[in-house]
Amino acid sequence: MSLAITRETLASHISDYAVIYDRDYCLWIETMMQLLREGKFSEIDIPNLLEELDDISGSQRDALESNLEIILMHLLKYLCQPQLRSRSWVLTIFEHRNRLKKAFRRSPSLQKHYQEIFPECYQTAKKMASITTGRLLSDFPEISPFSQEQVLSIDYLPD
């Protein structure tokens, strides 16, 4: 006798898909996708599906902010520590710019969030740069010395 839970056994014994969500997340996803494909919209676990969609949107925004903060931190280090510039810093900047470029291509609406969150991300990046360089927070410009366009430009590095 197999103890494995399958979509069919759960669906036949449990009509409430919210229970599947709590017991086996991957099975719940597969079940919801199948119900959508089959057009069985009345059976969809709407509350949990909405929660998951909200989480996906939040994850996209969190990733954007994290990538932006890393770019800004490395640009600040590059600007303020010219004697320590390294290819690894340039590679990190390139890698995270590329991630943002891909995110914007997949979800153009993230560009609005980028514009809105830029000042806040700069403040976080400034703190990160202060910690990693050992410099005072006041050693860094109060507002970003880099434009939003420069931060995204694949070829831009401060002098």
Question: At which residue positions do the language-model features occur?
Answer:
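Surface/interface-facing alpha-helical segments and adjacent flexible terminal/loop regions used
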Residues: 1-159
